[in-house]
Amino acid sequence: MHKIILIGYLLLSGLGVSAQTIPGNTGYAIPAETQEELFTSNGLQHWTDSKQIIQYFFYLRNTGSLELSIKLKTASKGNQIKVSVGGKEFLVAVPHNDKFVLKKIGSVPIHDTGFYCVTLGAFKTTGKTIADIESIQLSGSSIKGIQFNSKPRRNAASVHLRYALPDSFKAIQFYNEITVPPGGDPLYTYYMACGFKRGYFGMQVNSETERRIIFSVWDAGAEAVDRDKVSRENKVQLQAKGDQVVAEGFGNEGTGGHSHWVYNWKPGPTYKFLVTALPDSASKSTIYTGYFFIPEVQQWKLIASFKAPKDGSYLNHLYSFSENFMGENGQLFRKAYFGNQWIQNSDGKWKELLNSRFTLDATGQDGDRIDYGAGVEDGKFYLWHGGFKEANVKYGDSFTRRANNQSPVINLYKNTDSSIQAAEDRKLIYDAVSSGKYDTTAYKNGLYYKILKEGDGRYVQVSDTVVANYKGYLLNGEIFDQSKVPATFALNRLIKGWQVGLPLCKVGGKIRLIIPSALGYSIRARSPKIPPNSVLVFDIEVVAVKK
């Protein structure tokens, strides 16, 4: 009877809480491991760098005693390591053994709740390996309700902002801005600005020497790993890409079309992202295009345009996120601001997005990592994760930012690749003419043309309303549009190529225009049948003009 009472007392007082084991493969090395794998299914192994420290993090919800033990071994005699936790430091002789030995390190009084860290460092080494660590064992009254990551995935939790669209809104453009504060850009960070049901668009830190702007669109179907298994009718097709942009397929996290542009973005400046959607109900596909605004030159750049099959939808399921995509440095703090979100309806009207909802990936939802946050500062939403700081938000929390009331002004005609694309267009046109596919006899203001039939009326003027028959096609001969009956339009509302070319023709005449992309739609995706940067060919018969 006395034993039962004693056990009950111990449990209630916290002294009877079972010891907790932190697996050795859940720690972090500083500096982070590069070549040889440190953290394996057997714990910490191949720790050979005496300047490298190892850290294990945990969260205590109670004060009291903390007893620390470590299960470790080494192949070398005489090795010693320093172990510190909660302001106390211990010098530990590493057992020389071929099997792991559980060694008691010492006791630490815990006066405050919060995150704590066990730090291991080399003190004396006599061989190559400092120590192999199978696990860290914690006991004592303070560990009741302890939290730590017990899984080998060491990434910080991914954090998201979800933006709700108004009912019946047909979003054709999604605009967002990202600002990363100083120190908020560790390696292996992906700050994603414009996410939607079929893809995502943002910026990454890929290595010490490379950063990227990345735009990806998922294939149709359910294949998660191998894109070679995706049928052609389910594959995303590249329509166009910007200069020096790499475009290829991807797998292992779903499959799809990937594009990236190497660009040394920095903390401090605000970066602007724009995604457009051009749905085609006839083919049940949507063309998604990503544009990035380069602040140094104050111009937009086309990243890539992809045609997504089995779609036909407008932009929906809009979101942003911050991701730590490799776990070697998952202990580091990441933060970004997301501001000035706008969407454009199919009728051309812009709407500002003022509300967001916070969500987490499985790492956060399962409680493996609890260091994350979100909110509003200076009129912008923010996300942070990592750093083993206390969370200031929970799943599903909503936020509202103040309105800016100024929709984005976007000029895609003046873009960073204009001169390069102009040279490419000239070559394409020259090759087409040289091969005899097209004939042109004249050139004016960047436009190539040929009078196919002389008219008997006056010359067309830009201010005219024109009645005309026309056929439009790409350089490869593929027709994208043609009139069945004479069409009537105000010339000054059409593309620049028509405004330059039609005044060269008389009423009753017929003209062929070969229009470089800069005088056509440039990098814009304006038709499912016209990729960005397309050279356009038009045969136009001027029937009549009106003032």
Regions found by a protein language model. Give the residues of each.
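Bacterial Sec-dependent N-terminal signal peptides
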Residues: 1-21
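Short Pro-Gly-centered flexible turn/kink motifs
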Residues: 269-273
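Detector for glycine-centered tight turns/loop "hinges" at secondary-structure junctions
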Residues: 268, 297-298, 348, 446, ...
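Cross-family detector of peptidyl-prolyl cis-trans isomerase
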Residues: 410-547
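Short, glycine/serine-rich, charged loops/turns that create anion-binding
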Residues: 11, 75, 519
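Short, amphipathic alpha-helical segments
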Residues: 263-267, 423
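Short coil/turn motifs at beta-sheet boundaries
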Residues: 169, 266, 283, 461-463, ...
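Extracytoplasmic
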Residues: 20-264, 274-279, 283-413
